[in-house]
């Protein structure tokens, strides 16, 4: 029996009490929870129920009766349609406060820990919270009689929203994407049709090295074929000298994953170079690298502050990617070991260590939950561990290993407060949470990065 007093299509007044982990407003109607995208804490609004469930209602914002002083006009023309950003309508200082609150909400929801007893610091923000993303992944679509559009899927849909400019992207990523889009249209290159499973071009991926100016273009295709390849490469070379690497990645899977397993060089170099904390890093097409290079240095500074190192420690860099975090600390410890499941990332990490003159690092391809126990069996025990997992959080096998290893210091770098809280609840058996430091890596969105210091009990 439906206990929810709200009916679909019903319109009713609501006071927004709080904002949720996805940036939506939360209010209560006859004690039932109502989620309202676009509403801000303290606002009095009129909403319309669009989805009614037993325990909650999703509603759309119809009218604002009392506006929050933190409400601003979103500068992006496709903000409400796109779904890539959730907080452009919120003043930036209020965004930072919300992100700290998102961490608190996650602790409340997923653990029995009282967040009031934790030291959760104010969020570290950006001076200029725009144009920060160094990588774009724009889907393609054919419309009308041969017109090609590029953009992002709308929130919770597979409807492409065409985007001419994205104001959180580095300008060069948009410039290259738009140029390639026009080339695809000019030469009539077949665009992938998701429903039919036909066509070739699925996605245009562009990544730039902000400090080096080197830019990589990746054609994500449905087959190894790339019609008009020679003509397009010639035009790109002539018009876009900043593009120093052009790759093709083949993804024939019917899934939402961007990349497939097969990548090959079309022109230029296999990778681009980026600089971070006075180190140089090669980035291949599939390798993970933080999307906001400006805040990445702030993030790593917070990791550095968290760890107490004398120079005699062994350090594990789990989910190491191209080796950025571990190599930033290599000069402060006896040995760094890192692992990652993407072979190209490990190749990049090894090459980066050589390039940076670092010889006390060791890298291995594999899952962190498999590799760490293997190392322990071989007699290696880390004094400190840094984990920087994907949004899904740490694998339960890795959590088990971390509890067995009992490293003196554990720094958890998280991009998802919900999975962070879930993992902290388990790690709390052997580790004490010293503090949590939110860092705003993705301004204008509801995403928050958190550096958490844990010490062995």
From Swiss-Prot:
- Domain (TRAM): give its ranges: 5-63
Q: Does the keyword Hydrolase apply?
A: no
Which Enzyme Commission number(s) are on file for it?
2.1.1.-
Q: Where is the active site?
A: 415
> Which keywords does UniProt give here?
4Fe-4S, Iron, Iron-sulfur, Metal-binding, Methyltransferase, S-adenosyl-L-methionine, Transferase
GO BP term, pick one: rRNA base methylation
The top EC class, named as a word, is transferase
Query: Tell me, what is one Gene Ontology molecular-function annotation carried by this entry?
Result: 4 iron, 4 sulfur cluster binding
Instruction: Classify the source by domain of life.
Output: Bacteria
Binding of [4Fe-4S] cluster occurs at 76, 82, 85, 166
Question: Which amino acids does the record list as binding S-adenosyl-L-methionine?
Answer: 290, 319, 340, 388
Q: Per the UniProt record, which residue ranges are transmembrane?
A: none
Q: Which Pfam families match?
A: TRAM, tRNA_U5-meth_tr
Indicate the family of this protein. Answer: Belongs to the class I-like SAM-binding methyltransferase superfamily. RNA M5U methyltransferase family.
Which PANTHER family would you find in this protein's record? Answer: PTHR11061:SF45, RNA M5U METHYLTRANSFERASE
Name recorded for this polypeptide: Uncharacterized RNA methyltransferase lin1815
**Organism in which the protein naturally occurs:** Listeria innocua serovar 6a (strain ATCC BAA-680 / CLIP 11262)
Q: Give the organism's phylogenetic lineage.
A: Bacteria, Bacillati, Bacillota, Bacilli, Bacillales
């Amino acid at each position: 029996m439906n206990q929810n007093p709200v009916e679909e299509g019903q319109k009713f007044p609501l006071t927004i009490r709080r904002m949720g982990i996805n940036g939506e407003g939360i209010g209560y109607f006859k004690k039932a929870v109502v989620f309202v995208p676009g509403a801000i804490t303290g606002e009095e609004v009129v909403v319309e129920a669009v989805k009614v469930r037993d325990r909650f209602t999703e509603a759309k914002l119809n009218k604002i009766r009392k506006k929050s002083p933190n409400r601003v006009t979103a500068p992006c023309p496709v903000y409400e349609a796109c779904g890539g950003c959730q907080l452009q309508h919120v003043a930036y200082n209020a965004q930072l406060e919300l992100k700290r609150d998102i961490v608190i909400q996650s602790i409340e929801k997923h653990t029995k820990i009282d967040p009031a007893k934790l030291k959760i610091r104010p969020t570290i923000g950006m001076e200029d919270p725009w144009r920060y993303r160094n990588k774009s992944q724009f889907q393609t679509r054919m419309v009308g009689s041969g017109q090609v559009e590029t953009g992002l899927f709308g929130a919770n849909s597979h409807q492409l929203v065409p985007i001419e400019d994205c104001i959180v992207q580095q300008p060069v990523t948009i410039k290259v994407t738009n140029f390639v889009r026009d080339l695809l249209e000019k030469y009539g290159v077949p665009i992938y049709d998701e429903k039919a499973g036909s066509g070739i071009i699925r996605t245009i991926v562009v990544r730039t090295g902000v400090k080096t100016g080197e830019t990589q273009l990746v054609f994500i295709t449905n087959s190894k074929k790339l019609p008009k390849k020679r003509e397009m490469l010639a035009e790109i070379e002539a018009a876009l000298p900043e593009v120093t690497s052009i790759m093709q990645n083949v993804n024939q899977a019917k899934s939402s994953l961007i990349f497939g397993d097969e990548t090959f060089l079309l022109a230029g170099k296999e990778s681009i170079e980026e600089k971070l904390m006075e180190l140089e890093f090669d980035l291949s097409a599939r390798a993970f690298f933080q999307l906001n290079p400006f805040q990445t240095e702030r993030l790593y500074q917070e990791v550095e502050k968290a760890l107490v190192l004398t120079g005699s420690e062994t350090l594990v860099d789990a989910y190491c990617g191209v080796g950025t975090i571990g190599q930033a600390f290599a000069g402060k410890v006896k040995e760094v070991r890192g692992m990652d499941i993407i072979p190209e990332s490990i190749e990049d990490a090894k090459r980066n260590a050589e390039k940076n003159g670092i010889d006390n690092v060791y890298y291995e391809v594999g899952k962190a939950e498999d590799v760490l126990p293997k190392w322990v069996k071989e007699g290696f025990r880390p004094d400190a561990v840094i984990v920087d997992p994907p949004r899904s959080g740490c694998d339960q096998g890795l959590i088990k290993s971390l509890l067995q290893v009992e490293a003196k210091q554990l720094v958890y770098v998280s991009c998802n407060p919900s999975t962070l809280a879930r993992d902290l609840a388990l790690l709390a058996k052997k580790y004490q949470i010293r503090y949590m430091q939110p860092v705003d890596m993705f301004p204008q969105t509801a995403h928050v990065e958190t550096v958490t210091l844990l010490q062995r009990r």
